[in-house]
A protein has these predicted regions:
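N-terminal, polar/charged subdomain of small-to-medium soluble alpha/beta proteins
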Residues: 1-117
């Protein structure tokens, strides 16, 4: 997983940088090695915004969180991405289960017809 950190209209310290990277590295288990992650830090009118975008072949997951504390924004964006990943994973599992059932029903029907002939 490749990481890119973007700072808009502000500078972040090393503690925040390592905190964000450590949190985002936990998402590494959900994605393949060729995925790109962009973490954007920005500040507007006293509000701290963190935007995290993970790009992988066939999938883009994006989350943005705005609070008064940058660390809380990182935590909120990470939890939002984890929620999206769980939702996507559940959707894929349901699709695979439904497809598997249809294939089994077709095979069983074909076997039943052959037995009667």
């Amino acid at each position: 997983m490749k990481f890119t950190i973007v700072e808009r209209k502000m500078k972040i310290d090393d503690d925040l940088r390592t905190y964000a990277l450590r949190k985002v590295e936990k998402l590494d288990r959900y994605f393949q090695q060729d995925s790109d992650t962009t973490i954007t830090f920005s500040e507007l009118r006293g509000k701290q915004t963190v935007e995290i975008t993970v790009r992988q072949v066939g999938l883009v997951v994006r989350a943005e969180e705005t609070t008064t504390d940058m660390y809380a924004s990182v935590d909120g964006a990470i939890s939002s991405i984890e929620r999206q990943i769980r939702k996507h994973k559940t959707r894929l599992e349901k699709r695979l289960r439904e497809g598997a059932f249809d294939k089994m029903a077709e095979q069983k029907a074909a076997l039943t017809e052959e037995d009667f002939d």
